């Protein structure tokens, strides 16, 4: 069995960055800690506002960041705003999670692109519904009630262009046998069970040599229920494992 590599090239100020989907046995472990602060409201009011994001999507994204400190950008959850749409994304180089939703709707907004350590969001914050982000502070909220805050530092550098990995369309016409890493599938399913009432996932793909996208509908703790015409879909991109001929 072989694990296919998805390699793409990103240029930024004449600096080229390669991001690989690599075998899982090569991953290294690392941890990041944050310091909790008091007087959340007073501190928050003095900070420059960056974003207000649904808590659950940040928590899910944090489950799929890299644990390899040598690839620090991939240890972060990336928030991107483009064409009035916010993308929350994370990848460890093996799989990619992303969720897209409208900017400036239902109080959710993003003023600039930013990458934040996934460790900030990994722990379950009881009753949290949204996260307020400033230049130096992340505040967990229950509607308009402040729950807790942590200081953080933004990751410097240009996050990989994930759009280059996502297929534009799907034929769903497969001519060759293929398999998936069961751990990667199971880890996404564990998150889907918390956010989807029917606990169902859908596979979409073209051929086993290109990425597949697994989707699930978000309808538990979904803050977008009142947003007409928007279908909240969790997306999980993963490469098949092919047998050698």
Where are these regions (language model features)?
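Short, positively charged and aromatic/hydrophobic N-terminal segments
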Residues: 13-14
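DNA polymerase processivity clamps
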Residues: 5-7, 17-245
């Amino acid at each position: 069995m072989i694990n296919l590599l998805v390699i793409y090239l990103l240029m930024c100020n004449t600096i080229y960055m390669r991001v690989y989907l690599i075998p899982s046995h090569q991953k290294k472990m690392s941890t990041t800690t944050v310091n909790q602060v008091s007087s959340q409201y007073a501190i928050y009011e003095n900070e420059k506002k960056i974003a207000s994001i649904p808590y659950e999507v940040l928590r899910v994204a944090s489950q799929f960041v890299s644990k390899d400190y040598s690839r620090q950008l991939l240890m972060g959850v990336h928030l991107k705003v483009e064409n009035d749409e916010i993308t929350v994304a994370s990848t460890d180089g093996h799989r990619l999670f992303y969720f897209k939703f409208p900017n400036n709707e239902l109080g959710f907004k993003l003023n600039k692109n930013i990458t934040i350590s996934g460790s900030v969001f990994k722990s379950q914050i009881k009753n949290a519904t949204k996260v307020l982000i400033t230049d130096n502070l992340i505040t967990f909220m229950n509607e308009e009630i402040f729950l807790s805050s942590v200081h953080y530092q933004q990751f410097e550098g240009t996050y990989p262009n994930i759009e280059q990995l996502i297929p534009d369309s799907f034929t769903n016409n497969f001519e060759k046998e293929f398999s998936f890493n069961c751990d990667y599938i199971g880890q996404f399913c564990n998150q889907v069970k918390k956010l989807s009432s029917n606990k169902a996932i859908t596979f979409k793909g073209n051929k086993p040599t290109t990425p597949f996208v697994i989707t699930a509908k978000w309808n538990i703790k979904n803050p977008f229920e009142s947003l007409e015409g928007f279908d909240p879909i969790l997306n999980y991109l993963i490469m098949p494992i092919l047998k050698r001929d």
